Structure formats: C-alpha cells, structure tokens
Amino acid sequence: MAATDVDIFSNEEKRNLSLGGHVGFDSLPDQLVSKSVTQGFCFNILCVGETGIGKSTLMNTLFNTMFENEEASHYQNGVYLRPRTYDLQESNVHLKLTIVDTVGFGDQINKEESYKPIVDYIDTQFENYLQEELKVKRSLFNYHDTRIHICLYFISPTGHSLKSLDLVTMKKLDSKVNIIPIIAKADTISKSELHKFKIKIMSELVSNGVQIYQFPTDDEAVTEINSSMNAHLPFAVVGSVEEVKVGNKTVRARQYPWGVVQVENESHCDFVKLREMLIRVNMEDLREQTHARHYELYRRCKLEEMGFKDTDPDSQPFSLQETYEAKRKEFLGDLQKKEEEMRQMFVNKVKETEAELKEKERELHEKFEQLKRMHQEEKRKVEEKRRELEEEMNAFNRRKVAAETLSLSQPLKKDKDKKN
C-alpha cells in the first residue's frame, strides 16, 4: 500500500459498527492480566540519603519484611551504589524488587561530586537497556530491566532548609528519574516545625527549578486521591519493624520514654500515604514514566549523538532508511579519506625510511673507506718498520761476521810473533 493510500485511509472518518453476536475480544483485558501475572513485574527503587538516615529501615517497613542489610561506615572514600534484588510474592503476583542504596553519600568533606556515581549508575542502566533494544536478536521479554523507576530522596530532619548537596543532587537527577522527596525520621521534630519545613522544602525546590514526581491526575479513578496527596509532599515518614502493644492492638511503632510513634497512624507520620502512593496506586505509572519519559529522553539524545534524526535540516520527515544511507555514505567517505591518509602516511614513511637507509649506507661507506685508509696506513707503517728491522738485522749480522773474523785473526797474529 502506498504512503498516500495510508494517509487517505487514516484521515477517513471512523465508523462505529454494531456486532451481530459475541466475538470474544472483550476478553483482551483478562488475557493481558493473565499474561502479566505469568510474566511477573519488576520494580527498582533508588534510595538516596546520608548514612544512618534510615533508608534500610524504611524499605523493610514498606514491604513488611527484613531485607539483607549491611552496616555502612561513615568513613567511605567516595560514594558507591549497592544494588540488591529480591523475589517477592503477594497472593499470585510475583515482583522482582531491586533496592539500590547509595553507600557513603554525604559522608565526605568534599561533597562536590557526590552525585556523579548516582548519575552514572542511572545512565548505565539506560545504556544497558538501549543496547539490548538495538540488538538484531533481542529478548526484551526475558530481559531483567534494571532501570530506576523511583528515587526516594531522604532529607535530614533539620527543620530549617535543604542542604546544598540535596538541591544539587536532585537537580542533576530530575531529568533522569522520578523523584519523591521524603523527610526521614520525622518524629525528631515537632508538628509545627514539620509543617514549616515542608513548605520551606517545596519553596526551595520550585525556586531552584527541581522537578519532582507529581502523582498523575489525568485518570479519573485516582484523580481525587492523587491531587490530595500531591499537596502533602514531601512525605514525613517514620520507619520501624518493631512491634509495640498499644491498647489491645499490636502495631509497628517506635517506643520512646515520652510515648509511642505509630508507623501506620496517619496522625503521627505520612508513612501510609507514601506506601499507598508508591505501591498501591502509582507503581505502574512510575514504571511507565520511566520508560516513556526518562528513558526516551536518554534514547533520543543517544540516537541524535549517533546522527539519527526524525527530520532533515529543512524540517522535512527523514526516515530511518534515509538516515542509515546518509550515515553509511558519510562513513564510507570518512573511511576512504582515512584510507587515503593512511596510504599517504605509509608512502611518506617509506620515503623517510629509504632516505634514512641511504644516509646510513653513505655513512657506513664513508666509515668503511676511512677504515680502509687507516688500514693501508697501518700496513705501510708496519712494512716500513719491517724493512728497518731487516736492515738493522743485516747490519748486525755484518758486524757480527766482522767481529768473528777479527777474533779469529788475533790468535794467528800472536803465534806468528812468537815464532819470530
């Protein structure tokens, strides 16, 4: 079908037809539910906050279980992220939960780059998913999605204002992940201070342009509850897995000399609000927002870096095939250019090597001639010495013969004199 036919067909007025009998596609929601239950779900939580602020305790409280917790020291050289994955089941629903802890966050004297390991970790999970998506033979159905769906940002209950580290970190993260700020250990400040602290936090977030996750209000089923919960941000929470008896009931609470703070009592803290909003009402929206907003932004930026765009410089539609051909042509041009540069470089290198070899050959020849002349000079000197030595030997032999002749002639002369 031609493109024009598709355009004409898409612009036609849609008609509502009545069915003459039962067809069966009304079971599609049931099919989707059955498939989802069989496949299971994954949910990934990033907990950002200082050491000892109560991140692990809150996770245990949220999911009503005891996760593996390792005590973290306040003397870390830097920030590193520690992911832990657990398989949970509630009724017949399976959930693969990953909790990522930021170990050492806020413990260094120089906190200027404390956010970088967190940003790098989030980008790495996006990159892993993108690489799987770009494979020719991909398997997203079985792929363990590690993209962060929610960042719970734990704010210290100072009662005054946000720390610079908090503002910088949330600003760096707000375009990459859904952020829900929460005031940790909210039972350490009074209700009046807590109310003022919440207002101060939201004011500072707005003035610094930090975008936090807003519970969606476009779905009529959750519009009312989400609208009211947006007004309670940031949530002031208290975590505890200890059970305390209050009256005739046993509740999760924190026991103090002055009284008991009940975790699930909404007049004491916002824990129930956080749990409802995070898990019961908006968990799927957080997953969708991660994929449709944050991951798509990362994917678009990456593809644009690679040269893939939806429009050409004249803002005309540009298909993937055209982009591929343009990139292929550009790549081949660059390849030919580099081949020519390498060939020219090789030729120049060969010429330089030949010149160096010729120079070495000339130097060796000159050295050989010099050695040859030196050898001839030494040979001449040796020959001259030999001749001198032979002449001296001949002269010596002559003197020797003369001396022997003289010594023989002396006795004969004496005998002759005696006879006379």
Curated annotation (Swiss-Prot):
Organism domain of life: Eukaryota
Q: List the disulfide bonds.
A: none
Which terms are listed as keywords in the entry? Answer: Coiled coil, GTP-binding, Nucleotide-binding
Span list, region G4 motif: 184-187
| One term under GO cellular component | cell division site
- Asked if Coiled coil is a keyword of the record, the answer is yes
Where are the annotated coiled coils located? 321-407
Name the PROSITE patterns for this protein.
Answer: G_SEPTIN
Protein's recorded name:
Septin-8-A
Q: Which gene specifies this protein's sequence?
A: sept8a
